[in-house]
């Protein structure tokens, strides 16, 4: 597992109050991890802060899974 994935996983566990073993790259934030639209906004803000990046609004809409987040972050750090 990559460092980016582990950091994303930690943020997801803390923000969504889910068990760490449920946070896998294929997990959908909404369908698998129970996030709502506000949770998604808060996750993106946490990712931006953790990785010191800015995720544009149009990209935020395409981040629907843990893997989507990891891929985007890896491409911009």
Curated annotation (Swiss-Prot):
Write out the similarity annotation.
Answer: Belongs to the acyl carrier protein (ACP) family.
Q: Which domain of life is it from?
A: Bacteria
Pathway(s) it belongs to: Lipid metabolism; fatty acid biosynthesis
Organism of derivation: Hyphomonas neptunium (strain ATCC 15444)
Residue span(s) of domain Carrier: 2-77
Q: Which GO terms describe its cellular component?
A: cytosol; membrane
Gene Ontology biological-process entries: lipid A biosynthetic process
- Modified after translation how? 4'-phosphopantetheine is transferred from CoA to a specific serine of apo-ACP by AcpS. This modification is essential for activity because fatty acids are bound in thioester linkage to the sulfhydryl of the prosthetic group.
Q: Where in the cell is it found?
A: Cytoplasm
Q: Which Pfam families match?
A: PP-binding
Output this protein's name. Answer: Acyl carrier protein
The GO terms describing molecular function are: acyl binding; acyl carrier activity
